[in-house]
Amino acid sequence: MSTTFPGLVHDAEIRHDGSNSYRLMQLGCLESVANSTVAYSSSSPLTYSTTGTEFASPYFSTNHQYTPLHHQSFHYEFQHSHPAVTPDAYSLNSLHHSQQYYQQIHHGEPTDFINLHNARALKSSCLDEQRRELGCLDAYRRHDLSLMSHGSQYGMHPDQRLLPGPSLGLAAAGADDLQGSVEAQCGIVLNGQGGVIRRGGTCVVNPTDLFCSVPGRLSLLSSTSKYKVTIAEVKRRLSPPECLNASLLGGILRRAKSKNGGRCLREKLDRLGLNLPAGRRKAANVTLLTSLVEGEALHLARDFGYTCETEFPAKAVGEHLARQHMEQKEQTARKKMILATKQICKEFQDLLSQDRSPLGSSRPTPILDLDIQRHLTHFSLITHGFGTPAICAALSTFQTVLSEMLNYLEKHTTHKNGGAADSGQGHANSEKAPLRKASEAAVKEGKTEKTD
């Protein structure tokens, strides 16, 4: 027996303590067989390679008809290339077939170590056939097989990783399929508004969810207010045109500088599906508006508009500008110029009022053409939402100044025309007075002559 299986009984031959040598030989055989089931050939990670003499048909039980592995693979390829031949063209009952193999193995499993070795080899070949049917023979390497056998480190069931690869003869995935597969692998889904979110277990992160609350930079100590920063706003700071790095983003979010501050921030963003690579460089110039969150920038624009409306001396400025051109020949031309300027300014205001740049937790539907909307969105992203409302407030103030200029010119023209009319009427009355006196004197003289 030692000459036939020298590698299986060497442990039993070195024992000389008088124990049952056949029992020790059987234990050594079981240990060798157990080690051989986890060893794979270097040629194929999922193929159990042995010599032809070890798997001769006399070593199998009589109730099982052994089919070599290459015949099984040929039968599998023929069935899949001609699905009309096989009743189960889509391998829906592959699990049922594997259970039948398992029952056949255990029903006819021998007790001696030779048939035990052959039975374990048959189990390995059945597992290879099942993996072929599941479409993972050419898609995974040896370490992937160990992940499928014991469960992956990502907490997924092994069957969830059995995805068909391009080596199985399937059609290449298009751009949409590739994007969908990447989103599925990364756990990223798209909400109804087009925002990028990532699945975390069973919960779904919404871009409108609160990321943190930030104290204002421009508020006084007596009236400090906090502004809510959403996940969508953080994503806008990390995206073009700014592409802020971890240091600048930490400054905006008022995070204290620490040794691992950048790494902690990147890990938190990664859990939310946002990528902030280490060593990133900013893409835009840093201004004072860069340090403001969108809530504070909007608050600043609103206060600026209120101050312009209530405190700017629009009447005094308009009258001062109108008095510079009070000549009679220039007043008509000035009125036409002011009316044309008011019309152009109104058109500009109407355009800015239709801006639908994403801001805060809102992502409105665009109204303008995308050619002009993308430029307005770029300006809004650079100014953190301050730019467009501030310009609208300035244009409204300018409209008020133009209206005051027009009112002053019309009032002055009316006053001049009224004075000229009054002076002309007085001159006519003064010319008619001597005539009345002469006629009255003539009438008196006529009366005296009649009496005489």
Swiss-Prot record:
Q: Where is this region: Disordered?
A: 416-452
Q: Which domain of life is it from?
A: Eukaryota
- Basic and acidic residues composition-biased segments: 429-452
User: What's any one GO cellular component for it?
Assistant: nucleus
Q: Return one GO MF term.
A: RNA polymerase II transcription regulatory region sequence-specific DNA binding
This chain's protein is named Transcription factor AP-2-delta
Residues with Phosphoserine modification: 239
**What phylogenetic lineage does the species belong to?**
Eukaryota, Metazoa, Chordata, Craniata, Vertebrata
Q: What does this protein do?
A: Sequence-specific DNA-binding protein that interacts with inducible viral and cellular enhancer elements to regulate transcription of selected genes. AP-2 factors bind to the consensus sequence 5'-GCCNNNGGC-3' and activate genes involved in a large spectrum of important biological functions including proper eye, face, body wall, limb and neural tube development. They also suppress a number of genes including MCAM/MUC18, C/EBP alpha and MYC.
Which BP terms does GO give this entry? inferior colliculus development; negative regulation of neuron apoptotic process; positive regulation of DNA-templated transcription; positive regulation of transcription by RNA polymerase II; transcription by RNA polymerase II
Tissue specificity, in the record's words, reads: Expressed in both embryonic and newborn brain.
Keywords, alphabetical: Activator, DNA-binding, Nucleus, Phosphoprotein, Transcription, Transcription regulation
Q: Could you tell me which residues belong to the region H-S-H (helix-span-helix), dimerization?
A: 280-410
Which InterPro entries does this one have?
A: TF_AP2, TF_AP2_C
User: Where in the cell is the protein located?
Assistant: Nucleus
Outline the subunit composition: Binds DNA as a dimer. Can form homodimers or heterodimers with other AP-2 family members.
The principal location of this protein is nucleus
Q: Does the keyword Glycosyltransferase apply?
A: no
Indicate the family of this protein: Belongs to the AP-2 family.
